[in-house]
């Protein structure tokens, strides 16, 4: 907490007692941090802001804060607040609630007799990037996130937003959201909008035999991923997400599925495909084409989120040109990732033998792999990872290829997303180091102890 000095005017002459009919308070909030959890808004300490309001005490003991204003650098909140005898908010009205250059809204709130705070928000535009950043940090899906908010809060919230702004110049229009929390726990969520003003997106909290399941469906997966700052290199496709919100107190489990999409201009993918073993299998021209754009038919990514970490469990992606598997962890607290996987050139032909009983399992290996596969690892800093490729694995079929797997640092059967997939600010380009591509030199590296 940060101490804030209040300056008062309106003292009655000669008595030294407050004139409760019109006391004015002014404060400098520059060094204070302000939070509005319902909208993912935060004013950081150090950002200029001034507070002023007029205190009007009512005969019954309640208080109105009239002409309530918080103004400063890129910030303007104007309206009034009503308090009960215990100085708890009973209602507020902010006809103007704007911050930055992209958020322009009005907010009304009323505490009902049952203690539920009913909030209504409307506006032409809302900058949702801070909200999505908190969501992608994974702990916002877990019970541990409640410690940062009001655990006992009971909220009914509805919002209508003309244009919701996300990362990479992406946006959604005609956004409608209804949300209910009881005791700080999400119990109802319905949201819908149009990605880029065209393709529908829908989010819903469903009841599945007593468990809460969060579902999301988007008819433009690429725009949806860019909107929330998840992954910028995916184009097109349809996406579906299911998250079991009651899987555990700390972690949540889910599955992401995407169909009929392309990956375009991903620098980490280009690094993986730059290995000479890829040239030998794909041919130089197809290798260069794949670096620029790869078409996929299907992605399936089971995951576990919690404790500041995001784990992928035997995720796979496949298409006519290329397939891949991924296992490992992204640690948002340490800003590091550690993943391992196998990419499969000429996936459609390469995996055809998988249909042969017994022999197919031996030759192809895990789901999503093929007869010819090349193991790789992506490790290090989340913003600038290092790519390692093991060319010896191309000569080893199926289940025996696991001998050459890089150690992902997790128990067998867990894995991660990669490179630019998660966590970075998708609006910021960072200088990139050239990835170090090299074969394994010894058994120590083969075990992933590099």
Residues covered by each model-derived region:
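Solvent-exposed beta-strand/coil patches in large extracellular/periplasmic or lumenal scaffold regions
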Residues: 1-15, 19-86, 91-93, 134-344, ...
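Flexible beta-edge/linker motif
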Residues: 105-124, 246, 253
